Amino acid sequence: MISVPPTSRHRYTYRDALSKAAAQPFRMVPYFDPGVWGGDWMKTHFDLPDNGSNYAWSFDGVPEENSLLLDFGSCVVETPALNLVYAHPRELLGDRVHARFGKEFPIRFDMLDTMHGQNLSLQVHPLTEYIQSHFHMHYTQDESYYLLDAAGEAPCVYLGIKTGTKPEEMIDALQTAQNGGKPFPAEKFVNRIPVKKHDHVLIPAGTVHCSGADTMVLEISATPYIFTFKLWDWGRVDLDGKPRPIHLEHCAANIQWYRNTEWVHRNLVNTVAEVYTGENGTVVRTGLHELEFLDTFRFTTSSTLPVHRNGSVHMLNLVDGTRAVLRSKSDAFPPLELHYAETCIVPQAAGDYEISSPDGSEVKVILACVRN
């Protein structure tokens, strides 16, 4: 919530409030949706009400979907977060990012909960040239899965094509399954990658993928809204009792068949590189792949670590620990306390800041920004 103190005239306009929000870290109002594959991790950890089904998605870092709360003292106003993007794109994004994306927010954090649930649909996202020519979008949905948690006997992510797969054989098997024939043998054609908590799996567009059951994923991705082409939905129907759509023609045109078993393990699974190690903690780069325009860094500290800007808006999530605090190095904004699994945005105009653990316990924060 953005607190808006009164001016000397004892009033603050809506535009003034957006201007204030563009210069300090803020959280948006999250919302949660059920899905056929949904689980129960978010219900337990976020103390959500029983909805009679499950919780599959959480949108906590998506300005296109979320809202802001503006506290004027005598009243609280809820407003679309996109209004901030439209009103103050340079302050929010930074000049460099604004020059590339205009009034579009390029980073998305959302959550996928399959804990005690089911696999997501097997899917692929369109290549840049495909989404431009077919859907007139500027850029595509490159993404990644950061594992907040994993449980059960063999949690996994399906990722890339198994070495030796013949494209025509896989497409024929998918078409047969779509026509009501033999179910698609996913593990014959797609790599099944074992995962654990804090693994980071990178998913550039064109890579076949889905998260498996018993995982809790923080999805870090680019945001051209939602373009997901489904190959296989495990023979199930949606919550409304109807089959979900399959997009085999789009899929066949976008699957990158060279991303086989060896390539996936070499390029897309836990490509962690040390950035900084000192007495106050560590910083590692966890992604994303060079084909993607986002960088992600994990800060681990029991004390305080500085965060320097690279000309880009930052999006953060506390992936381990009870709470962390973001503080301005120049007192440019009031401290923001971030709780476990919460997401926040730090505008470029907020300047340099620090991540600290208020009680001395270890915290881990994942940070995403647009790469230089």
Residue ranges and their predicted role:
Residues T114-N119, L127, A150-A154, T207-I226, ...:
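Ligand-binding loop in jelly-roll beta-barrel domains
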Residues G181-W234:
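Loop-centered beta-sheet repeat module
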Residues M1-E168, D233-E274, T296-R298, N372:
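Transition-metal
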Residues D149-L202:
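Intrinsically disordered, low-complexity linker/loop segments enriched in Gly/Pro
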Residues M111, M137, E143-Y146, R192-I193, ...:
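His/acidic/aromatic-lined binding-pocket segments of jelly-roll/cupin-type domains
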Residues N270-C344:
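Acidic/His-leaning functional-site neighborhoods
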Residues G73-S74, A213-H247, Y276, G311, ...:
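Non-heme Fe(II)/2-oxoglutarate
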Residues F189-L202, R327-A350:
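Short acidic-glycine-tyrosine-enriched beta hairpin
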